[in-house]
């Protein structure tokens, strides 16, 4: 297992500056958040030259571009909107391939909760669109990671993958805090995502021992199944980017040390 951070932790940094920060604190990957005007340039509008340059910078630094995290989801009842999102996701798959980024995060929330089969229908619709996207992603050597986020709990993400018939390029981004915030404990959530976790987001705060203990348990469960992906720090526009990176890097070292005991 490896540790990364999202560009939202350092929203004013270029690729070169992100790489310097990663090296300073011992991070092995960087997750690029497009669409938020970060100066890293990993965007759909990036030229072939920019894409090639990013790929070369990451390779030279021996730090992985581990994920691209756009705001793409297929939970809309308007299928025309889903069609537009699918076309956009296809473009992100090309961007990921061009920058040697093996994962793309996608959303699946908010889920409808109005009865009359709306949630079940939404599962099926998301599975349909994600299956189409996963077929394209597989051709490009990219994995799509449906994030456990908001009302998309572990049980919900697991159901979408089940209805999609588990395509090889469709995985889960297990952001544990969203499970805990919606009444789904660690081991309960794990039963629904086991064997299909391709990526994980995490964040902790100073003194939040409960959060640290939950993260340590999540890491223990994933280590037990041989997970070799990234735990990526998601913190949006913190007041002190360097301190945030340092704190999470230290927490990650403690977690790895605990796994070795």
Label every model-predicted segment.
Residues 3-7, 30-32, 65-70, 104-106, ...:
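Hydrophobic faces of well-ordered beta-strands that scaffold small-molecule active sites
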Residues 9-11, 34-36, 72-74, 108-113, ...:
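Active-site-proximal loop/turn and secondary-structure-junction residues that shape catalytic pockets
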Residues 11-22, 81-94, 182-191, 214-218:
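Short, acidic/polar
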Residues 16-17, 52, 57-64, 74-172, ...:
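Active-site acidic/histidine proton-transfer and metal-coordination neighborhood
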Residues 16-35, 100:
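Catalytic domains of carbohydrate-active enzymes, especially glycoside hydrolases
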Residues 19, 39-45, 117, 178-230, ...:
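Gly/Pro-rich active-site loop or hairpin
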Residues 31-55, 109-115:
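Glycine-rich, proline-tolerant flexible connector loops at the mouths of alpha/beta enzymes
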Residues 242-261:
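C-terminal helical cap(s) of enzyme catalytic domains, especially alpha/beta-barrels
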């Amino acid at each position: 297992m490896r540790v990364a951070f999202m560009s939202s932790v350092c929203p004013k940094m270029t690729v070169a500056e992100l790489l310097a920060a990663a090296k300073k604190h011992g991070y092995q990957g960087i997750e690029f958040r497009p669409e938020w005007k970060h100066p890293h340039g990993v965007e759909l509008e990036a030229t072939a030259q920019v894409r090639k340059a990013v790929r070369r910078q990451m390779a030279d630094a021996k730090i992985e571009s581990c994920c691209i995290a756009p705001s793409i989801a297929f939970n809309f009842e308007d299928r025309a909107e889903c069609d537009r999102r699918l076309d956009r996701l296809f473009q992100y798959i090309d961007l990921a391939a061009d920058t040697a980024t093996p994962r793309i995060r996608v959303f699946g929330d908010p889920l409808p909760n109005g009865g009359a089969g709306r949630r079940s229908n939404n599962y099926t619709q998301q599975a349909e669109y994600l299956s189409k996207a996963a077929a394209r992603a597989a051709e490009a050597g990219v994995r799509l990671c449906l994030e456990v986020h908001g009302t998309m709990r572990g049980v919900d993400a697991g159901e979408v993958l089940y209805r999609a018939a588990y395509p090889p390029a469709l995985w889960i981004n297990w952001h544990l805090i969203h499970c805990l915030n919606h009444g789904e404990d660690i081991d309960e959530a794990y039963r629904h995502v086991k064997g299909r976790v391709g990526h994980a987001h995490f964040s902790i705060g100073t003194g939040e021992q409960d959060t640290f203990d939950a993260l340590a348990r999540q890491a223990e469960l994933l280590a037990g199944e041989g997970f070799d992906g990234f735990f990526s720090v998601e913190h949006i526009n913190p007041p002190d980017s360097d301190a945030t990176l340092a704190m999470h890097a230290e927490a990650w070292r403690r977690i790895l040390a605990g796994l070795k005991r």
